[in-house]
């Protein structure tokens, strides 16, 4: 399917840019090296987004702006590298079953954490890293916002984009999260709602949510 799409694109364009899911969460970027061999005579640019979900769309917007000036491949890659460092997120994990089943949390520790109803905070900055735990959802959100701020300094620089990524389907639950987050960030900006990608919930399980912030 990808080969067919590329063939069609190269009939219309001299250069094709592919922005992939973060290589820390998927092998898709590495697999493109095989495809690039088939297009040696074409101008194909493959860039690791180091991001997920709506964060990739934010990067696409930046790339489209730069493409108006006919940038070099190196300028495109540099832009994505710089902007991806501003897009940081993390997951608040309520259900530890998938983490225990996948061996990412030892069974004994997992049983204790479940008994105490602990929420795990998992940051992603290109890959997943366990950062903290707390029994309280509001405190978990506060801690995650601090963790993100330590990386991209959104409190100082301001927020360019922010989103809640979730597979939750209860609208009132999502709206409650949105209201709580709006109060905590203390900035006037629309909070988008987007999907929690499969590469995330494959590790942390279902019925969780993440916060993704792009700093200015």
From Swiss-Prot:
The DegV domain, residue ranges: 1-215
GO MF terms held by the record: lipid binding
Pfam families (UniProt xref): DegV
SUPFAM superfamilies named in the record: DAK1/DegV-like
UniProtKB keywords: Lipid-binding
Signal sequence, renumbered to the chain: none
InterPro entries: DegV, DegV_C, DegV_domain_contain
Gene3D superfamilies, per the entry: 3.30.1180.10, 3.40.50.10170
Binding of hexadecanoate, residues: 26
NCBIfam families: DegV
Main function: May bind long-chain fatty acids, such as palmitate, and may play a role in lipid transport or fatty acid metabolism.
The protein's name: DegV domain-containing protein UU190
Classification of source organism: Bacteria, Bacillati, Mycoplasmatota, Mycoplasmoidales, Mycoplasmoidaceae
């Amino acid at each position: 399917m990808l080969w067919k799409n590329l063939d069609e694109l190269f009939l219309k364009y001299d250069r094709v840019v592919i922005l992939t899911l973060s290589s820390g969460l998927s092998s898709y970027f590495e697999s493109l090296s095989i495809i690039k061999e088939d297009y040696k005579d074409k101008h194909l640019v493959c860039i690791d987004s180091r991001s997920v979900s709506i964060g990739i769309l934010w990067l696409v917007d930046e790339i489209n702006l730069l493409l108006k000036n006919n940038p070099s491949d190196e300028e495109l890659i540099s832009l994505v590298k710089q902007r991806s460092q501003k897009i940081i997120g993390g997951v608040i994990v309520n259900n530890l079953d998938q983490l225990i089943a996948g061996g990412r949390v030892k069974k004994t520790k997992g049983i204790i954490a479940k008994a105490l109803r602990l929420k795990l905070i998992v940051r992603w900055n290109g890959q997943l890293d366990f950062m903290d735990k707390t029994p309280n959802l509001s405190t978990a959100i506060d801690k995650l916002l601090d963790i993100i701020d330590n990386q991209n300094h959104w409190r100082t620089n301001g927020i360019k984009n922010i989103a809640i990524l979730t597979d939750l389907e209860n609208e009132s639950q999502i709206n409650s999260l949105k209201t709580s987050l709006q109060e905590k960030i203390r900035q006037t900006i629309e909070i988008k709602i987007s999907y929690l990608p499969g590469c995330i919930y494959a590790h942390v399980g279902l019925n969780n949510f993440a916060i993704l912030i792009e700093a200015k």
